[in-house]
Amino acid sequence: MIDRRDENTFKLVSKYQPSGDQPQAIEQLVDNIEGGEKAQILLGATGTGKTYTMSQVISKVNKPTLVIAHNKTLAGQLYGEFKEFFPENAVEYFVSYYDYYQPEAYVPSSDTYIEKDSSVNDEIDKLRHSATSSLLERNDVIVVASVSCIYGLGSPKEYADSAVSLRPGQEISRDQLLNQLVDIQFERNDFDFQRGRFRVRGDVVEVFPASRDEHAFRIEFFGDEIDRIREIESLTGKILGEAEHLVLFPATHFVTNDEHMEASIAKIQAELASQLKVFESEGKLLEAQRLKQRTEYDIEMLREMGYTNGVENYSRHMDGRSEGEPPYTLLDFFPEDFLIMIDESHMTMGQIKGMYNGDQARKKMLVDYGFRLPSALDNRPLRREEFESHVHQIVYVSATPGDYELEQTDTIVEQIIRPTGLLDPIVEVRPTMGQMDDLLGEINLRTERGERTFITTLTKKMAEDLTDYLKEMGVKVKYMHSDIKTLERTEIIRDLRLGVFDVLIGINLLREGIDVPEVSLVAILDADKEGFLRNERGLIQTIGRAARNSQGRVIMYADKMTESMQKAIDETARRRQIQMAYNEEHGIVPQTIKKEIRDLISITKGTNTEVEEESLDYSVMTKSERQEAIKKLQKQMHEAAELLDFELAAQIRDMVLELKSMD
């Protein structure tokens, strides 16, 4: 394991004190961790402040912590919240750095080879480097990650051993430093100074670390000795301070030294020779020629540049791993005694399980048709059992824990009471006969009170028919289907909150970002049709959409009571009873959550100024107008990222991608 040089402790900063059943949940979780419990579940109802509880636990157990979410948006939200709770500690963000990613693939039926195509988000790449360097330098680290954290990354030992350590007074010549920087994949560019680059002016070398975005370092030499190291603003060169010690980690996570490189190339060549014999014996001459040409080109690039596109496909040889051995991942950068928290574990653990099979199916096709060596199969995500082998202690966090989590542990810590006093909604079951008229009456009641309604159906046709019917009846209604893009989806939710329309119909309204405090009625059609969206967990998640309004109510339309319905109704009633008893004992009156309705493209700064993009019809713009709009949006995206509002930055990014696709 890598020795951390820093023993900092976590310091939680919050104007809140634990309330409701947060204190007992925090105490139980901490006691279980300190008592050596390997796995436990935090069963937290929607809106009970699970992130705050997680933060309290982290600050008390004081271990490096990995928090895994099931998508970038949720990871971004959690990252922002943890940054606020721990301003003095290292809170890092580690997700896939691809804005756009088309993996390398081959389709035999049409003889189509699809080359890997991607667009790397520079900001996220910086944050990934920041995460790995923090993990090697200190202990007070929280990394919020997507399942990207189980994908192959370079060896942490190579990454750490390759780091360049510099101090004032150190004997090293300027040229020695330049050679070391090139070895760890820094690029010399005296004119365009960006992350992962350095520039030289006489006896002064300026280096821009891969983990920074505004600050660089100026290393001043006196002969063959470092005279001083200064931190500077990368753009202006303004001096920000003196540094007593500077550690420069490699500019890429896949790095190896010259000695290892030659050994790796020898292994690649041996595997190539072996695979060529296999193809030739099978009469696959085209595949053999293809593989020979591609691999020899990559070897030449590795020899000359120390890097090649797709270098990760040779990671087994670079890392010195055996066939089938799991790759290094972000988890290997953590010390042995670290804590894992899985947010929305009922979704995330399913993702962790499924990543390996999909990756192998695609790569096997590339190997079979001579596009990659068989060792490329070992550049892969971890299998679930390999992930489990990294687990020292883990907390699964969910309102509806999955079967997997429940099999792993009997230790369940409940957090049912909301700080706002809000109760789980009342759930009714009504017959399907006459359901349209009944539903219309319920909608009108809510509309008169200025409240909103969610309706969830099972089929696209039913959603469309219901939308048409309600429109004929004078209801302001919209249907949100799967073809709607991220940005438009956010606009729809905002319009619902503003009252542009009163009813939203969808098939799956469980997705993140769909919590709307104005919604007081959730109607579930075909509630008795068992399946993914009508199982116990799906129903509890849907019921939770009405839990942010003091008038919250759920109506299930069904002709029979299924086991899933009964379990969901019983669990909701159980939670509601606990919440009512607590409110009565403490004299709390439930209050609907007050949540600001934010403009779609607005970033509020400390000065309360706003950057806004008017709502325009981009389809009628000229190409030059679209290019101008893209520039404006990219500026706003970077401003959002600087303010750590990654949810908004992601929305703007999606809008930019939509605009680019029009050209």
Curated annotation (Swiss-Prot):
List where the motif Beta-hairpin lies.
97-120
* Gene Ontology CC terms: cytoplasm; excinuclease repair complex
Cellular localisation:
Cytoplasm
Extract the Pfam families matched here: Helicase_C, ResIII, UVR, UvrB, UvrB_inter
A single GO molecular-function term is: excinuclease ABC activity
Q: Which residues form the Helicase ATP-binding domain?
A: 31-271
Q: InterPro entries from the xrefs?
A: Helicase/UvrB_N, Helicase_ATP-bd, Helicase_C-like, P-loop_NTPase, UVR_dom, UVR_dom_sf, UvrB, UvrB_inter
Q: Which UniProt keywords apply?
A: ATP-binding, Cytoplasm, DNA damage, DNA excision, DNA repair, Excision nuclease, Helicase, Hydrolase, Nucleotide-binding, SOS response
> Quick one: a GO biological-process term for this protein?
SOS response
Which cysteine-cysteine pairs are annotated as disulfide bonds in the entry? none
* Xref: SUPFAM superfamilies: C-terminal UvrC-binding domain of UvrB, P-loop containing nucleoside triphosphate hydrolases
Q: Where does ATP bind?
A: G44, A45, T46, G47, T48, G49, K50, T51
Q: Where is the Helicase C-terminal domain?
A: 435-601
Residue intervals of the UVR domain: 627-662
* Cited function: The UvrABC repair system catalyzes the recognition and processing of DNA lesions. A damage recognition complex composed of 2 UvrA and 2 UvrB subunits scans DNA for abnormalities. Upon binding of the UvrA(2)B(2) complex to a putative damaged site, the DNA wraps around one UvrB monomer. DNA wrap is dependent on ATP binding by UvrB and probably causes local melting of the DNA helix, facilitating insertion of UvrB beta-hairpin between the DNA strands. Then UvrB probes one DNA strand for the presence of a lesion.
The family database entries (PANTHER family) matched by this protein are listed as:
UVRABC SYSTEM PROTEIN B
* Family designation: Belongs to the UvrB family.
UniProt note: domains: The beta-hairpin motif is involved in DNA binding.
How the protein assembles, per its UniProt entry?
Forms a heterotetramer with UvrA during the search for lesions. Interacts with UvrC in an incision complex.
The protein in question is named UvrABC system protein B
The organism encoding this protein is Streptococcus uberis (strain ATCC BAA-854 / 0140J)
Gene expressing this chain: uvrB
